[in-house]
Regions:
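Cys/His-rich zinc-coordinating "finger/knuckle" motifs
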Residues: 436-442, 453-456
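A broadly conserved sequence feature marking short terminus-proximal activation segments
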Residues: 35-45, 375, 383-427
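Short metal-coordination and nucleic-acid-contact micro-motifs, chiefly zinc-binding Cys/His arrays
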Residues: 425-428, 442-445
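A generic structural motif
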Residues: 1, 61-63, 142, 339, ...
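Cys/His-coordinated zinc-binding microdomains
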Residues: 433-436, 447-450
Length: 460
């Protein structure tokens, strides 16, 4: 708005006429000798009828007498031979698209005008001036401008420079969804670059999103369930649902404001940071090793089901083909994902500050584990006994909770200001690979796995 306003404020007067042989004629008659323009509704009506039937070529010297009618002497008037500036033509597009009646679903004014950033002094402005002069307001409610695509080095693409990129070849190499992901990931308000390395980055993002859906499809295979009252769900699941509700609100806001860069960033970050690197990582033990009747496992899969239905809808405008593939894989007879409504997610809340503190401590623990893993003292966090500063632990988490959330053998609280890690002396369960006091020696089963195996054997 500011940019258009400043350009309108500083622009000179607009000369609408052009001396060209081809274009939209200025259908006026000028009185010889006085230069006075003829203003007669009946004359105008005859001109309009002729143009409507025969096009702009109807404005011809041979029809002067027909247009003027019996009330005027054709020899007293001259037909204007000038045409309208083509920018005036473009500025009238709102009239013949939104008011012609040919497309009843379209209404004036337009919801949105979309064009390149150069149109602030072009189409956006010509449309604004024409509409304000004839209708007293802008022909659009909103304007969205898009920057131009530049070569990877920031230069304008040019055949002479040999730096042009053929979208069809890019699609053959990367696929249409990766191009869409790239286009929606850039800041559309500015000029943006494209090249092999940039597209490879978009490809990496795409694979992470695709892997999220692949995990969800595998984890939900054969799932039929309902977690019931959210208050009965494990706290981690409540937290993830709260994150989903927060994401939903932010994505709605981004979509409503055409902030597609933020939309894709929020979606990718949620899948990578909150799901793959956090939630999925923590709950894989429950998914793979708990029994079919496990309350925690059922709660996890129920949340995964909610995540699936939300994420596939969120991804559909960005990854149109992948989202359709994902949806039809789980629901072969479920129609198209692109005909689904926006998801309705549970309005769940959680103490975000408390969980942020917990996740910060988790990062500290993972950083402290890494040197031991790199030096082959331990192979994973499951072999680590961890001591954390008591002051860094949020209220409400037991040591067992922390061990589960940090994916370690054990967690204890101490007076130190830093995280300390040692290799545990416990033995490793042969089924879940956790190192626990209940395992007598490596390869034996822990109490949980013994119960699960016994249940499965009994049901066989």
């Amino acid at each position: 708005r500011r940019r258009i306003g400043s350009m309108v404020e500083g622009r000179p007067d607009w000369v609408l006429s052009r001396q060209r042989a081809w274009g939209v004629p200025i259908t006026l008659f000028v009185k010889n000798g006085t230069g006075e323009y003829l203003q007669d509704p009946e004359v105008n009506a005859r001109v309009i009828a002729a143009v409507r039937e025969h096009g702009v070529d109807a404005w011809d010297e041979g029809r002067k007498a027909e247009f003027l009618g019996e009330a005027y002497n054709p020899d007293d008037y001259e037909m204007v031979a000038d045409i309208l500036d083509v920018w005036f033509d473009s500025g009238c597009t709102h009239a013949f698209t939104l008011e012609s009646g040919r497309w009843p679903a379209l209404q004036w004014p337009a919801d949105l005008y979309l064009e390149g950033s150069d149109q602030h002094r072009g189409w956006f402005q010509s449309s604004l001036l024409e509409s304000c002069a004839t209708r007293g307001r802008a022909p659009y409610d909103q304007v969205l401008t898009h920057g131009f695509t530049m070569a990877s080095d920031g230069r304008k693409m040019s055949k002479s420079l040999g730096n042009t990129i053929d979208p069809l070849k890019v699609m053959e190499q990367y696929g249409a969804d990766i191009i869409r992901l790239w286009a929606l990931s850039v800041d559309s308000t500015e000029d943006h670059r494209i090249g092999d390395e940039i597209l490879k980055g978009a490809g990496d993002q795409y694979r992470k999103l695709r892997n999220t859906f692949r995990y969800l499809l595998g984890a939900l295979d054969g799932f039929i369930g309902d977690m019931g009252d959210v208050g009965e769900v494990p706290e981690l699941e409540v937290y993830i649902l709260a994150l989903l509700a927060d994401l939903d609100g932010k994505l709605r806001h981004a979509a409503e404001n055409y902030d597609f860069n933020a939309y894709t960033r929020l979606l990718v970050d949620f899948c990578n940071e909150d799901l793959s690197a956090f939630y999925f990582d923590i709950r894989k033990d429950v998914l793979y090793c708990d029994g079919p009747g496990s309350v925690k496992r059922n709660a996890y899969r129920t949340v995964l089901d909610l995540l699936f239905h939300a994420l596939v809808r969120y991804a559909a405008p960005v990854l149109v083909f992948t989202a359709e593939e994902v949806w039809s894989t789980r629901y072969p007879d479920g129609g198209s994902v692109h005909l689904l409504e926006w998801p309705q997610v549970p309005g769940v809340t959680a103490d975000g500050a408390r969980w942020a503190q917990l996740r910060e401590l988790r990062e500290d623990v993972m950083e402290a584990i890494e040197p031991l893993r790199r030096d082959k003292v331990i192979r994973s966090g499951l072999e680590a006994d961890v001591a954390v500063p008591a002051s860094a632990v949020p209220e409400g988490f037991s040591d067992a909770d922390l061990a589960e959330l940090f994916i370690t053998a054990s967690v204890a609280r101490g007076d130190s200001d830093t995280v300390a890690v040692t290799r545990t002396d416990e033995s490793k369960c042969g089924r879940c690979w956790r190192l626990l006091p209940s395992v007598a020696e490596d390869g034996d089963l822990c109490d949980r796995c013994e119960d699960v195996v016994a249940t499965l054997d009994g049901a066989a």
